[in-house]
Each structure stands twice: as C-alpha cells, then as structure tokens.
Amino acid sequence: YPFKTGEEYVWFIAIEDKEVVGFVPVEQKSRKKAVINNYYVKAEGTVREEILSHLLPAIVAEFRPESWLLNSVTLVQDKGTFEKFEFVSMDKKWTRYVKMYR
C-alpha cells in the first residue's frame, strides 16, 4: 500500500486465509500521543465491524490509556465500532471522517 512509513509507525494487520483483509497504521508522535489514520478494511457491514473488532483491542492493548493519548481519524461509517472500544468523538468532523480519541 503506498503509504509513507517509518520507525514511528506500528502496523496492525488482519489476515484471513493468507490474504490481508485490513490494516491500521498507528503513528507514534511525541509526548505519548499516537494517531490512527489511513486505515483500510476490505469489507462492508457486519464483516467490516468484525475485522475492526479484532484490530482495535490489539491497538488499545499496545497503546494503553494510562500511558498514551490515542487519536483516530475515523470514517463516519466506523464511528459506532470505535465507540464500542471507548473512543469518543471530538468536535472536529469532516464530510466522511470524524476525529476521535481514547
């Protein structure tokens, strides 16, 4: 996937039958802040929610709230799934995305 990446990124990848079905790059910023942006899930509806529901707990475990502020630029269609993992909407909203934090 054509993303710029480096040592400051941690990638969480969902694989099914040797095929990548989703990924979430998390950029580690200064002062224990991490940002989810440009994630991809190769599904819609309940399958999409299921894939994200496998990826998000791994991210939350890696970036624990006691140590990290975790922000996300979340697709509006995924907002409910992120809320299940205690992400909260911020005031910032675009047409297709909403900024969230945990």
Question: Whereabouts are the PLM-identified features?
Answer:
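Conserved active-site alpha-helix within GNAT-family acetyltransferase domains
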Residues: 74-94
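Conserved GNAT acetyl-CoA-binding A-motif
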Residues: 61-74
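Conserved acetyl-CoA binding element of GNAT-fold acetyltransferases
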Residues: 32-44, 95
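Active-site beta-strand termini and strand-to-loop segments that position acidic
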Residues: 15-17, 99-102
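Conserved beta-strand in the GNAT
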Residues: 13, 18-27, 35
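Active-site rim helix/loop that mediates acceptor-substrate recognition in acyltransferases
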Residues: 1-11
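Conserved acetyl-CoA-binding loop-helix of GNAT-fold acetyltransferases
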Residues: 46-61
